[in-house]
């Protein structure tokens, strides 16, 4: 029987599985900590895996308005303090990747390694305009209006057709978002990569940057540019996958995560 612990600390709902060096998983916009269910089984035999709901997501409280990246960084710090963690590995997906970069810059002593999955970096004006158009759609029509296009960006057509249950699950996560808070956090996602791009060269911990070959919004080029800026980083591009490749082909991501952590923690 799995030893799974759940808790809530100062408005943040979290779960913990496994034993060993601590690894904290930080999810992306519009979903929740359950997105990591495809990674837990691979990571928990060797690591203490902690995953939580971001502010405004899942079972955690809403953020203050206006939303700022610093709020989400502070949430992570509060959680680490509440769990008595002095230092850990951080894995961030999409918005989560932006959050853990911010955290690593502000609290370098608390991060021993960093993994950035499918995370935007230095968008062009046209790329940012495209994301902001989706923000406007969410503002005018609510989270549900963004769901179908998101699933198309996130998964291959073949995988979507063969896995309707997974599509329904993730669709329900998107639709469950607060219609007022969701667009506010979406706007943060659309804009905050700009504030980070010139400072990430100060990140010194070992860093793995990964994305899918076909993740158009968080492209291989973005990952390669980011990895070139961070002194102790490398980029890996996973063939044939879109934004949520870690769900479509978990093993492709999980094997690389485990190998990287074993290399860092040995």
What do these predicted ranges mean?
Residues 233-266:
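Catalytic active-site module of serine/aspartate enzymes centered on a nucleophile-bearing elbow/loop
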């Amino acid at each position: 029987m799995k030893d799974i612990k759940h808790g809530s600390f100062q408005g943040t709902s979290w779960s913990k599985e496994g034993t060993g060096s601590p690894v904290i998983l930080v999810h992306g916009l519009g979903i929740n900590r359950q997105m990591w269910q495809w990674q837990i089984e691979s990571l928990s035999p060797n690591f203490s895996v902690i995953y939580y709901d971001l502010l405004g997501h899942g079972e955690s409280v809403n953020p203050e308005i206006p939303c700022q990246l610093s709020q989400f960084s502070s949430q992570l710090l509060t959680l680490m303090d509440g769990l008595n963690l002095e230092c850990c590995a951080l894995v961030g997906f999409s918005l989560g990747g932006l959050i853990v970069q911010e955290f690593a810059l502000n609290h370098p002593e608390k991060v021993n390694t960093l993994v950035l999955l499918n995370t935007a970096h230095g968008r062009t004006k046209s790329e940012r305009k495209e994301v902001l158009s989706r923000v406007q759609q969410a503002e005018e029509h609510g989270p549900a209006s963004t769901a179908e296009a998101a699933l198309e960006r996130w998964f291959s057509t073949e995988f979507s057709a063969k896995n309707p249950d997974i599509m329904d699950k993730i669709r329900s996560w998107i639709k469950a978002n607060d219609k007022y808070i969701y667009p506010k956090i979406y706007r943060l996602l659309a804009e905050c990569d700009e504030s980070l791009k010139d400072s990430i060269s100060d990140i010194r911990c070992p860093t793995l940057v990964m994305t899918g070959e076909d993740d158009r919004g968080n492209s291989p080029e973005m990952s390669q540019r980011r990895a070139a800026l961070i002194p102790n980083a490398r980029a890996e591009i996973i063939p044939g996958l879109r934004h949520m490749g870690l769900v479509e082909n978990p093993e492709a991501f999980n094997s690389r995560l485990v190998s990287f952590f074993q290399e860092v923690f040995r």
